[in-house]
Amino acid sequence: MRYKITVEYNGSSFSGWQKQQHSANSIQEKIENAIFNFSGEKIALYCGGRTDAGVHALGQVAHFDMEKECELYRIRNAINYHLKSIPIVVLNAEVVDDAFHARFSAKKRYYEYRIVNRYAPAALETGYVWQVFSPLDVNIMREAAKHLLGKHDLSSFRSKDCHAANPIRTIDDIDIVQNGNHIHIKISAISFLHNQVRIIAGTLVEFGKNRTNPQEMLHILSQCKRSAAGVTAPPFGLYLVKIDY
């Protein structure tokens, strides 16, 4: 039977979602071990969005196949019991069709990048936001972001380690919400290149700091090279919010 779980986690202390050969500190491995501890079955867990080290999730989605049949609330509670000392929580579990795949069945992924824009240290949010000390012009950031909407070659906004064969992606929505000194960059698309959201966030911050002409974003896009865009924002400000199916 195939089960789908929705997962929330604090990514600060993990090596990322995906299992790694020389590390036992991935989120995937922690959940697989928790499932084994209550079911006795060695399962393979597949996720909807592979987050890097330090990245958080409010609504990661994963699936696994298990022979043992359990009531859904028991699956959720049993996994959480075996994760109780770890900042990973299963929010809910459901049975899905065998054709469902957490990665390949996804129709849209939603990310949010969180910034605190003030000079005084963000004592209560360290590790959960990127603190930018210089004042940001959010209106310029919004105007620059509009040029990223739609279908583009996003080679300027992917890491040098990105292995995607095709750099063309379609950004469905990008919105920048300001509440006092908190700035959230919200972005959604069916798929993303490696580090795409973090590089976009870093680039938009540079626009906001330097009061750069928003039209300059078109030049960055046209260059199709990583060096044209801004810095890669730190991982701890990034959240995988949810995935639509």
UniProtKB/Swiss-Prot annotation:
Disulfide bonds: none annotated. Signal peptide: none annotated. Substrate binds at residue 111. It holds the Pfam family PseudoU_synth_1. One of its GO terms (molecular function) is tRNA pseudouridine(38-40) synthase activity. The active site is at residue 52. Its EC number is 5.4.99.12. Keywords: Isomerase, tRNA processing. One of its GO terms (biological process) is tRNA pseudouridine synthesis. InterPro entries: PsdUridine_synth_cat_dom_sf (IPR020103), PsdUridine_synth_TruA (IPR001406), PsdUridine_synth_TruA_a/b_dom (IPR020097), PsdUridine_synth_TruA_C (IPR020095), TruA/RsuA/RluB/E/F_N (IPR020094). Coiled coil: none annotated. It comes from the Bacteria. It catalyses: uridine(38/39/40) in tRNA = pseudouridine(38/39/40) in tRNA. Formation of pseudouridine at positions 38, 39 and 40 in the anticodon stem and loop of transfer RNAs. HAMAP family: TruA. Homodimer. Belongs to the tRNA pseudouridine synthase TruA family. This is tRNA pseudouridine synthase A. It comes from Wolbachia sp. subsp. Drosophila simulans (strain wRi). The lineage of its organism: Bacteria, Pseudomonadati, Pseudomonadota, Alphaproteobacteria, Rickettsiales.
